[in-house]
Structure formats: structure tokens, C-alpha cells
């Protein structure tokens, strides 16, 4: 199963980068597969660590896609990284292995520590649709224009029916 998250990584100068990521999780391992080239890829190779943030706040996903990544964040204790101040929880992960691939290498990460901040309050179709729209926007170079417009048209139905004020 793919879980939509916000992954934060840092470069060697401790500048943080936030990216929306569909990660895979199995037991105590998390699999992160960034595209080549990407800042997440460069940072994971350089620092061998990341923070996986769990949130249903779609504004994080939208703002990452449009390049507005000035989020409220906190420094992790005893770990090189930052987590989103407003998330359900997060996991600090360390890269243990890299599976090479020409398009999307996979970083096999071990969970160092998990943190719970607040409770998840349930699923919302509008939020899921907005996250799906962000995924489409991040793949404009891979998908046809008509396919994207068709998908967005369908997704807008759930947003119109179930959105709150934030969506």
C-alpha cells in the first residue's frame, strides 16, 4: 500500500526540503522512491536520513506542488531533521540500502523513532481528491493533457460535495 505523506530531508547545510511522497511501509521499514533528479534524492544520498510526516492537511501537498514550502516546523531531538509542527505524527528514518534505478531509485529506510502528536479524525473524499490532483500536477510531463483534465473534472465532484472551508 502507498501512503501519501510529506517527507522532509535536509542538505549538508541543514536546509530543509519538504516534498509530497507516496511511501511504502512494511514492518519497521519505509521505502522512499524519488525521481531523478530531485532535491529529495540529493539530500537522501548526502545525509542518509529523512522525516516522514503524516497529515491530512491538503495545504501541505498543494503548497509543495506550487513551490511555497515555508511551513511551521520543529527540529527533531537527537536526529538530523525537521518535522511539520501541524501533523498527526512523524517517523525519523535512516537509509540502510539504496536500490538503483534509472528513473526512481528506492531508499530502503529503517524507522529510528515514531512520534504521535494528535489524533487522526477520519477520512474525507475532498481531501483525497485534492491530494490526487496534486499527484496529477506533479506528473504533467508524463500524462496527456486530456487525461489530466478528465481526471480533474471527476475529482472536482468529491470536492464540491464534501469539502470544508480549507479545501
Language-model regions, residue ranges each:
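Basic, polyanion-binding surface patches
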Residues: 1-90, 94-167
Amino acid at each position: 500500500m502507498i501512503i501519501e505523506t510529506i517527507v522532509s530531508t535536509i542538505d549538508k547545510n541543514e536546509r530543509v526540503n519538504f516534498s509530497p511522497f507516496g511511501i511504502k511501509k512494511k514492518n519497521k521499514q519505509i521505502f522512499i522512491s524519488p525521481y531523478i533528479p530531485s532535491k529529495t534524492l540529493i539530500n537522501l544520498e548526502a545525509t542518509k536520513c529523512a522525516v516522514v510526516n503524516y497529515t491530512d492537511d491538503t495545504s501541505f501537498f498543494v503548497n509543495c506542488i506550487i513551490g511555497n514550502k515555508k511551513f511551521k516546523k520543529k527540529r527533531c531531538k537527537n536526529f538530523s531533521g525537521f518535522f511539520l509542527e501541524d501533523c498527526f505524527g512523524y517517523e525519523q528514518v535512516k537509509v540502510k540500502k539504496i536500490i538503483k534505478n534509472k528513473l526512481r531509485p528506492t531508499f530502503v529506510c529503517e524507522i529510528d523513532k515514531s512520534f504521535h502528536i494528535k489524533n487522526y479524525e477520519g477520512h474525507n473524499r475532498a481531501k483525497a481528491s485534492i491530494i490526487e490532483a496534486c499527484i496529477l500536477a506533479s506528473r504533467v510531463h508524463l500524462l496527456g493533457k486530456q487525461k489530466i483534465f478528465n481526471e480533474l473534472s471527476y475529482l472536482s465532484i468529491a470536492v464540491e460535495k464534501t469539502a470544508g472551508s480549507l479545501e
